[in-house]
Amino acid sequence: MRERLRPAVERDWPEIAAVLQRHGLPLDGAADHLADFVVAESDEGICGVAGLEVHGEAALLRSVAVVAPGDGLGTRLVTHVITQAEARGIRDLVLLTTTAGAFFPRFGFTAVSRDDVPAALRTSAEFQGACPASALVMRRTSRHAELP
């Protein structure tokens, strides 16, 4: 059965937190932005998640995780969240990753320095220590990128 994507709701938080923890992703600040998260749901429950942390006209793409990688669900989730961001007029997306630097270029993300990140995003929990300083910073501006 193909997973159904839907907006996250408050009652999803325990399952979302479990998926994120299983992948070693930070929980700091995630619950505060749950209204901008999407989950993938199968008959067994939540099997994937991706979220936005919106700060003005820019957003942090965060908390991208799937229970069983390799079936394209991660691509579906990221594409969905990017499309939602663009529909809201958000054209500048940034992410931090320690493990998935090879996954995100297909969506138009390129490596940048922390200094290239909009100031509003540098105040997020992820930039303030939830992600290690060694994390790769990637940025996507929609006017320069096509989705897979």
Where are these regions (language model features)?
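Short amphipathic alpha-helix that is part of the acyltransferase structural core
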Residues: 1-29, 41, 135-137, 141-148
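A generic "binding-loop/recognition-motif" signal
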Residues: 12, 57, 99-100
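Conserved beta-strand in the GNAT
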Residues: 39, 44-54, 58-65
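A short, internal acetyl-CoA/4′-phosphopantetheine-binding micro-motif in the GNAT/acyltransferase core
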Residues: 64-72, 99
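Conserved acetyl-CoA-binding loop-helix of GNAT-fold acetyltransferases
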Residues: 71-85, 95
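Conserved active-site alpha-helix within GNAT-family acetyltransferase domains
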Residues: 98-128
